[in-house]
Amino acid sequence: MEARVILIATTNKHKIEEINEVLQSCGYRVEPAAASKLEVQSNRLEDVAAYAAIQAYLALQRPVIVEDAGLFVEALGGFPGPYSSYVFKTIGIRGLLKLLEDVENRRAYFKSVIALAHSGGVEVFTGTVHGVIAEKPRGDRGFGYDPVFIPEGSSKTFAEMETQEKNKFSHRGKAARELCRWLRQYGPPR
Amino acid sequence: MEARVILIATTNKHKIEEINEVLQSCGYRVEPAAASKLEVQSNRLEDVAAYAAIQAYLALQRPVIVEDAGLFVEALGGFPGPYSSYVFKTIGIRGLLKLLEDVENRRAYFKSVIALAHSGGVEVFTGTVHGVIAEKPRGDRGFGYDPVFIPEGSSKTFAEMETQEKNKFSHRGKAARELCRWLRQYGPPR
């Protein structure tokens, strides 16, 4: 059976690959859409993703997914949180590790929000993974902060894992499995 | 002559005081409006302020000002930039100084954008001030990163200056003077 296609408003190949690894189990796959993504500035990832998905749906007039994720470091008051991508592009992993020099509490969590906008409204699926920030980057897979995030239950960083293994632990894998559940229950979005 | 009132979508008393110190020279003052501020996530302050001002105008049906500002640190790739307020609330001045430990290049600039939305559209006024990040916080006036910003032409931080002196140098003072110029030329916004 051929997988049904849902559009996703991203050009991040890693995100697409990770989500597709999960969605194949329910007979779907995502493909990038050329929609500009209007992001609202909010401390809630849910708001950012839902709003962007609605905007993309209005532009495309087809069901569309937006995924937004953030890394929340406990000792830094949740920083970089909803602005993880901007922070990654400016101070990067090096800056993050500098902020955590001599900081004992390395606890952090990743959160992913998948928003699916369709003719019936917008559905929001979330996934969270707790873990710690490594002392040094390890691994070359994945993207973003993956080289310094070690999820609970593993001694590897996300960047040391294949997609399938990362998805077992990851925030994005969990959110994508929630999306699968919804698709199984309600069928193809329109 | 009594000053004409323009609404401003902020609850930050420092911003209001600084803008009013300039606006009195052209016969206006701003007063806080109870409009929720929808911020778009953009790397351009102009977009954030203009969009928020339009939203506030639509909600209030009266001319309204939004001021948005950011601190751009050269050695940090422009960080914290448009997310200065969020970064201040999480890692704070302490985090910023930690990122700059052993960094020789302390150059930074503050930028302020004042957007005025009215029945004729939206006007955007900007002001920039170049300077350096101090080694340690000094002074207790102002707000945000003021204790660590030393503008070119002074040896004081913004937090060591009275409002009037800060306005002579500051990004916000410059943007407010641009607004004054516009108000003198076009009269009260409707």
UniProtKB/Swiss-Prot annotation, chains A, B:
Origin species: Hyperthermus butylicus (strain DSM 5456 / JCM 9403 / PLM1-5)
According to the record, cofactor stoichiometry and binding are noted as: Binds 1 Mg(2+) ion per subunit.
Highest taxon in the source lineage: Archaea
Q: What is this protein called?
A: dITP/XTP pyrophosphatase
Keywords recorded for this protein, A-Z: Hydrolase, Magnesium, Metal-binding, Nucleotide metabolism, Nucleotide-binding
In which family does this protein belong, per the annotation? Belongs to the HAM1 NTPase family.
- Which Enzyme Commission numbers does its entry carry? 3.6.1.66
Relate the protein's function as given in its record.
Answer: Pyrophosphatase that catalyzes the hydrolysis of nucleoside triphosphates to their monophosphate derivatives, with a high preference for the non-canonical purine nucleotides XTP (xanthosine triphosphate), dITP (deoxyinosine triphosphate) and ITP. Seems to function as a house-cleaning enzyme that removes non-canonical purine nucleotides from the nucleotide pool, thus preventing their incorporation into DNA/RNA and avoiding chromosomal lesions.
- Name the positions where substrate binds: T10, T11, N12, K13, H14, K15, A69, F143, G144, Y145, D146, K166, H171, R172
> Quaternary structure per UniProt?
Homodimer.
Example GO molecular function: metal ion binding
